[in-house]
Each structure stands twice: as C-alpha cells, then as structure tokens.
C-alpha cells in the first residue's frame, strides 16, 4: 500500500510581526538569510519563535537580528548552550548592506523585522526600512481605514437602490 501524504499547511510562514505596520511607516523591503545553529532549526520547525519585538541592528558593517526569541526544545542536547535571545547574523549582499547602512545612518530609518519564513530549506527574514509613527499618524490611518469601509458600504447601498 502507498503511504498517505500528511496534510501540511501550504504556508511557508514561520512567524509574523503584526504590529510592525501599525507602529511604523514601512518603505523598502529586504530579504536576508539567517545564520542559525542546529537546535534553533529544530525549534523553528516546531514553531517556537517570537519576532514581535525584534529589529535589525548594524554593527561592524554587518546586520544582526536582535530581540528574536527562539525557545529551545525540551529535548535539546545538554552539551550545547542554548541562548534563546542571542544575536543572529543576517546574510546579505554587500550592495544591500551599503544601501541599508546609508539609509539608517543618514536618514534616521529603523530596520523592522516583519516576517520569518521558509524558502526552500532555508529560513529567511523579511524586514523593512521604516520610521516610527506618532500617535496622530496612527489615528489618521485608522480614520482612513474606517472611511474606506464606509465608502464601500455607501457604494454598495447606492448600487442596490437602482
């Protein structure tokens, strides 16, 4: 008999930072690989990742992911020291790094991690250049969203009256 395929989700997304779009105005998108250890890959496969408060930091002309929490499994080996909050190096092209460094140093942008996902067998991090929003910016975005919903309702009702 043939084995049945297990039902797996088609999504390659590991973790999302849902508050990033709310707290920052995001401009340029970047994708980078991550330098990970074996226990981290096992934990990521089991879904023990949190990137809600993490960001990318430039140090010595290299990019590092700070604040991401990858919790070790209970069955992790005892001879390896598992630090869930360690800084993880991002693997980027020199041209991308130069562009990022210029924007961060000159223009005052921040680097915000928005998603972690699988691409083939590698873990990738999606991050954006962005600036923090003030409270009035957040309020105006909420008003714009509500107006778009109301406008859709009005147009729907207007079309039904015909």
From Swiss-Prot:
CDD domains listed in its UniProt record: SmpB
GO MF term (any one): RNA binding
Domain of life, per lineage: Bacteria
SUPFAM superfamilies found in the cross-reference section: Small protein B (SmpB)
Main location as per UniProt: cytoplasm
GO cellular component, one term: cytosol
InterPro entries, per the entry: SmpB, SsrA-bd_prot
Places the protein is found: Cytoplasm
A single BP term in Gene Ontology: trans-translation
Keywords linked to the UniProt accession: Cytoplasm, RNA-binding
Chain's role: Required for rescue of stalled ribosomes mediated by trans-translation. Binds to transfer-messenger RNA (tmRNA), required for stable association of tmRNA with ribosomes. tmRNA and SmpB together mimic tRNA shape, replacing the anticodon stem-loop with SmpB. tmRNA is encoded by the ssrA gene; the 2 termini fold to resemble tRNA(Ala) and it encodes a 'tag peptide', a short internal open reading frame. During trans-translation Ala-aminoacylated tmRNA acts like a tRNA, entering the A-site of stalled ribosomes, displacing the stalled mRNA.
Family stated for the protein in its record: Belongs to the SmpB family.
HAMAP family: SmpB (MF_00023)
Protein name: SsrA-binding protein
Originating gene: smpB
